Amino acid sequence: YSEKISLRYNKINILENIDIEIKKGEILSILGPNGAGKSSLLNILSGSIVSHEGNVFYDEENINNISIQKRAFIRSVMSQSQSVVFDFSVRDIVEMGWLDKGDYRYSNNINKAIIGVLEECEIKYLENRKFNTLSGGEQRRVHFARSLIQLWRESNTDDPRYLMLDEPTANLDLSHQIK
C-alpha cells in the first residue's frame, strides 16, 4: 500500500497525495491521458524511483528499506519500453527472468516453468528465434513471459506477489490484447 505519494518534475506536481491499497488477488488498473503520471506512479510503487513525499509499503515494510534482491522476490515489473541490446533468443530472455533472482542453478523444474510460460504466452514456436527479429507485439509477449517467470520461481511461498505492468497491451494485436 502507499500513503500520500507525491511527485514533482520541475516544480510541477505530477502526483499529489496518492493513497493506494492492493490486497492479495486484486487487480488494479490505472487509466489516464498521456503524461498524467501513470508510469511514474508504477515506478514509485515498484521502488524504481523515490517519491518526493509519502511512502510505499510491502507487507508493512517500507520499500526504501527493502534490498533490491528482496524486491525481486516480491514483485515483477514490465516497463513501458524494454530494449534488448544483445543477440539473445526468446528462451534466453525469458530465462533471464529466473536468473534475475540470483539463482543460477538449472533444473528440470526451471525448464518446465519456462516451457509452460512460453506456451501460456503463445510464443513457444518462437523459443529459438532471436529477439531482435521479432515484431513489436511478439517482443511485448516475450517481456510479459519474462515477468511471469520472475513470479513463478517463488510462487509456492506465502510472500506477497505483485505483477506490475506498464502499457501491457502496447503493440499487441486485438486477440492478444483481449487474452
Language-model segments: which ranges?
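Conserved structural motif at the start of ABC-family nucleotide-binding domains
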Residues: 2, 15-17
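The feature captures the beta-strand-to-loop junction immediately N-terminal to the Walker
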Residues: 31-33
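Helix-to-loop junction immediately C-terminal to a conserved catalytic motif
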Residues: 46
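Conserved ABC transporter NBD signature motif
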Residues: 54-62, 162
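ABC ATPase NBD coupling module
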Residues: 62-76, 104-107
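Conserved ABC ATPase "signature" region
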Residues: 109-126
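Catalytic Walker B motif of ABC-type/P-loop ATPase nucleotide-binding domains
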Residues: 156-158, 163-167
